[in-house]
Amino acid sequence: MRRLLEPCWWILFLKITSSVLHYVVCFPALTEGYVGALHENRHGSAVQIRRRKASGDPYWAYSGAYGPEHWVTSSVSCGGRHQSPIDILDQYARVGEEYQELQLDGFDNESSNKTWMKNTGKTVAILLKDDYFVSGAGLPGRFKAEKVEFHWGHSNGSAGSEHSINGRRFPVEMQIFFYNPDDFDSFQTAISENRIIGAMAIFFQVSPRDNSALDPIIHGLKGVVHHEKETFLDPFVLRDLLPASLGSYYRYTGSLTTPPCSEIVEWIVFRRPVPISYHQLEAFYSIFTTEQQDHVKSVEYLRNNFRPQQRLHDRVVSKSAVRDSWNHDMTDFLENPLGTEASKVCSSPPIHMKVQPLNQTALQVSWSQPETIYHPPIMNYMISYSWTKNEDEKEKTFTKDSDKDLKATISHVSPDSLYLFRVQAVCRNDMRSDFSQTMLFQANTTRIFQGTRIVKTGVPTASPASSADMAPISSGSSTWTSSGIPFSFVSMATGMGPSSSGSQATVASVVTSTLLAGLGFGGGGISSFPSTVWPTRLPTAASASKQAARPVLATTEALASPGPDGDSSPTKDGEGTEEGEKDEKSESEDGEREHEEDGEKDSEKKEKSGVTHAAEERNQTEPSPTPSSPNRTAEGGHQTIPGHEQDHTAVPTDQTGGRRDAGPGLDPDMVTSTQVPPTATEEQYAGSDPKRPEMPSKKPMSRGDRFSEDSRFITVNPAEKNTSGMISRPAPGRMEWIIPLIVVSALTFVCLILLIAVLVYWRGCNKIKSKGFPRRFREVPSSGERGEKGSRKCFQTAHFYVEDSSSPRVVPNESIPIIPIPDDMEAIPVKQFVKHIGELYSNNQHGFSEDFEEVQRCTADMNITAEHSNHPENKHKNRYINILAYDHSRVKLRPLPGKDSKHSDYINANYVDGYNKAKAYIATQGPLKSTFEDFWRMIWEQNTGIIVMITNLVEKGRRKCDQYWPTENSEEYGNIIVTLKSTKIHACYTVRRFSIRNTKVKKGQKGNPKGRQNERVVIQYHYTQWPDMGVPEYALPVLTFVRRSSAARMPETGPVLVHCSAGVGRTGTYIVIDSMLQQIKDKSTVNVLGFLKHIRTQRNYLVQTEEQYIFIHDALLEAILGKETEVSSNQLHSYVNSILIPGVGGKTRLEKQFKLVTQCNAKYVECFSAQKECNKEKNRNSSVVPSERARVGLAPLPGMKGTDYINASYIMGYYRSNEFIITQHPLPHTTKDFWRMIWDHNAQIIVMLPDNQSLAEDEFVYWPSREESMNCEAFTVTLISKDRLCLSNEEQIIIHDFILEATQDDYVLEVRHFQCPKWPNPDAPISSTFELINVIKEEALTRDGPTIVHDEYGAVSAGMLCALTTLSQQLENENAVDVFQVAKMINLMRPGVFTDIEQYQFIYKAMLSLVSTKENGNGPMTVDKNGAVLIADESDPAESMESLV
């Protein structure tokens, strides 16, 4: 019987589902990177830049401290009177007879494969390698094009052009730059010589269709997403990127729009724009830039990369004199927001409509001017209002001058009437704007009417609403707020009215009798409204094309899946497809607006929804019915509203008269019928498209379409009214649809009965199986059990967490998506992983891009919901509005008794599977102050022992996480008392040990065998060197961090809690690396792609950027090649012995390690600053120079190039990432640079290790004598004392003390200089090497800033001192050493330090000697007050590696 019922269950489920489900349009949520709409008011790329002491050329940016207003400090020309860009006023531009047709040469040819595109960090530039020439248009000669640059705005077609025409700006501006090839060989040379250059400005305007000519450019943009990326472009025709007609253009003389702002540019600004679709436009908004801070890189979206417009001053703007080029109206070329020419509207609609009562008989209507004006100026506003009373319909219209306040007072208002208001802007020649939102007002309740929905926005009549009640639901076209007013109705009207240009008004909409009853009328009091009540514009060509694939119903529009906030989100006409195609990546964790920052603005957000419904709200005097109330059913069936005797059901019909299903998320018996009178306008519209397809009757339903538990759906008796589709025709008889309805209902009822029987039987079987398990679902069998069954998988199956009976239910039916499980077949053997990564890196990292796109798409078709996160009671608990917790995998807290227990189980956290372990991790956001108690409650309830934190509290001036632990002593968070026990600081991370105690659990209570269950230990591993939306500079420290935090987990503890700021990007990267390291150890295979796709189904956006995805592979490659090299001190002798034994090929592991130390990835050792011509003479040895990532920068001197460079590198120590600075012995002409470095970086210790004594006296001594100070402009250097310190072998260290005094203020810096003898000394015992190290370590404890170490070249001696210092500190603190990591990190940060295997072998010898000294009881050597060494080592000077081993 069971074998028979198992397949029946699936067949019946699919059959029933397919009969009631419908088409759904999905919208991707805003990602962490998608900062777009959240920061539109900010100019620039949202990068908050701190003033840096190091930079290359004069640094500038589009915002912040180096923004346009500060450009003049480094480029004086930026303050000139003839600057660009400008706003061009067409009416003041004169026609210049000298400006005739442009002559283009080569523009019609396809570009060669040498043309390439580069992300410069400020823009995206195309470097033209072919010959493109321009003449005419008043240019002084024949000019050659060299490069193309782009400027764009923030998001979604917002203004981004630099120039504007009549105040109108465009989404993108393309600029083509030219130079005179007869005079110069390059564009840059012409600029440096300050000679005339040319520039074309071409505007891009949004269009409903893709522009195929832009395809090579858009494809190229996807290859240069990150800063400094370059790619070759597919062939394109440059002429196709220009307007179709080149006759209409403006000419003026201006400047470059970026520093140096040279006023040498002859500008040609084309009047006609080039079309670009929203989908293509998204490629610009996905571009990243980087901000370098010290040697940590942060990644930001590059947006708003345009300069503010400048004054025209005494310049004249001219127009071309090409005949007939200026005849057309401007709207033929400057398209309306929907991208069609059919809509000749004056402006966008007036916004911010409000209706407020002044007294008992008067109302005030207010609005704001339109956001965009196509035909300025606005002359006046037309205010229309209509009302209905006792079936009499009236309407009045009056005008209001635009120069007065935008308010109107309506007198003699009756409290018993329903009023509808709308406003329209009127320009010259009686051109009018779109209508504003239609506001419905009755008594003290205001509602917005738009399309198929009515939303209330009024004020309370009984009691004030709570802040949660007034919180907006989502952004969109309507506002949904509540104020405690009893409100229970549904409007299912779809308006199709006239265009704004003045055609006759027709209305295809009716408010149901239920609506009127909800507004105070008796049932059925009004059957329809006059045809002039709700006129809206006829759909444009763009919307028609959208609706061709999705016909509009008279009863309801198609529903949409949840948008960023989980609400059903419809598309606006002309925008829907493009919005639906937004790339998930267009978002920044870093760029998002945090919830707490926007609390004040929440009331201005709007909700997108294609579902016609209204949430039933109650004031404090009306009790809310419970789910068990007889007034409604629990599972979304008929819902009876008090005051209505009966619910009626209507099935709408499609155009062909066949049965039409309700929208997704709505059962057919929940659709409200409305009367839609047939009109000629609709008939013409529907019949005008011969290719319009019929709507299929069956579509998959989106389980994401949900309603709150207070939503009620009311139906109206269809017998009273006719129903109509988009085409006018006689209404069908009542029996035509009642008989099929009865048949279908009967079949559905029979199927449901059978389905319930199957479910009961199925559940009974599962209960028998799971007997003995406390949870509803059985635990997934171990990998061994699955292997015995022949279905062994690489990872555990997806786990879903069923609602507890005590948890609040937001929706009646919570669906569980079917999630695929990664297979062992996808795993890559470790031996092939190196080759695999090489393939991914090939072809400009194309393999990584393809993989990550697959990751982004993997959850697109899964209807995974996050309704609890979107619930109004929980929204304030989310740090970011678009980072939500999936319902099926969310961590549920135990509800708190009493205090709002209904929603106290929510926290923005999800269980995430690990390698062969379900729920191995909890991925969560950085706690908000308001969620500290929930955070620690979750840690207690989940028995978490390890917290992994991968964010700093503040990054780039923005709050990323609140400090949820006490700085010292104890702090109480709800019932949990947290005590800080210890803090250990490392170079890249910090470890904190907490004791947590639950005050509600008593010591030794029953069931507590240990007697101390009320107190636990929690360890926090906090990584401090990982930038938001970016990746760490080096993989080795991350591997150490992951391994140590993973090893600290105890078997009896619960999941590891991992969080960053949003809990997705860096959190996901950590989880993947940790799990893959475990898989490598267990099976010697790797499956990054499969595992990431799997965990993406458990929390959204895990591993947020492609850069993070690449970093995972880099880190795993490092782990595979280097293996684990950390060794405890008691095993060091045997370990060294093992790596000295030759292998099969005759090579020892020591040799293999050293090869990895010296072979570094090219991207880590870029040294282009050191190789500049102006800096080459500052290097003693060209083979020992700083890598760009770790280069020490100087504060540049004003007006002098290259003054920021010095041959010096940061080196990571044990306690700080910049603990040391290794540099060369100063050259005579770099001595002042050396002291500037000390001054800039507050260094207080200098260790001088001369490799030989061959330096001349004047070169050897770079410090001043006692008699005379050294003047370094901003400060002076004075020698104040000189001492000597004797070592055990009678060698001496000469100690100089200097004072650096500022010339402008009282700041003083004390510096101690150690002039050391030859070190390490080959004639002395190896163990004596640590004498000098101990002296330096002890001195460093009392001083701040990095320790500067130098030998002649800044190479092996200095590197050896840093390495041994770090390793000795590691040995003291951890009783373990990692020679390989320390040596490789030094070579990564300063290439060329260790070049000989004997140098690497010496480090092992020294550490063996130090370990032997500790084992023999001789602790570290110290120095007494007089400088004498208290413990001297008398070891044999002939120590060798063999003897040490």
From Swiss-Prot:
Residues 592-620, 689-711 have a biased composition (Basic and acidic residues). Residues 461-480, 557-711 are annotated as: Disordered. GO terms for cellular component: extracellular exosome; plasma membrane. GO terms for biological process: cell surface receptor protein tyrosine kinase signaling pathway; negative regulation of epithelial cell migration; negative regulation of neuron projection development; neuron projection development; signal transduction. It holds the Pfam family Y_phosphatase. Residues 576-591 have a biased composition (Acidic residues). Found in a variety of tissues. Residues 763-1445 are cytoplasmic. It catalyses: O-phospho-L-tyrosyl-[protein] + H2O = L-tyrosyl-[protein] + phosphate. Residues 848-1119, 1150-1410 form the Tyrosine-protein phosphatase domain. InterPro entries: Alpha_CARP_receptor-type (IPR041887), CA_dom (IPR001148), CA_dom_sf (IPR036398), FN3_dom (IPR003961), FN3_sf (IPR036116), Ig-like_fold (IPR013783), Prot-tyrosine_phosphatase-like (IPR029021), Protein-Tyr_Phosphatase (IPR050348). It is a single-pass type I membrane protein. Residues 671-682 have a biased composition (Polar residues). Residues 20-736 are extracellular. The active site is at C1060. Residues 1-19 form the signal peptide. Disulfide bonds join C78-C261. It is an enzyme of class 3 (hydrolase). Keywords: Disulfide bond, Glycoprotein, Hydrolase, Membrane, Phosphoprotein, Protein phosphatase, Repeat, Signal, Transmembrane, Transmembrane helix. Possesses tyrosine phosphatase activity. Belongs to the protein-tyrosine phosphatase family. Receptor class 5 subfamily. This is Receptor-type tyrosine-protein phosphatase gamma. It comes from Homo sapiens (Human).
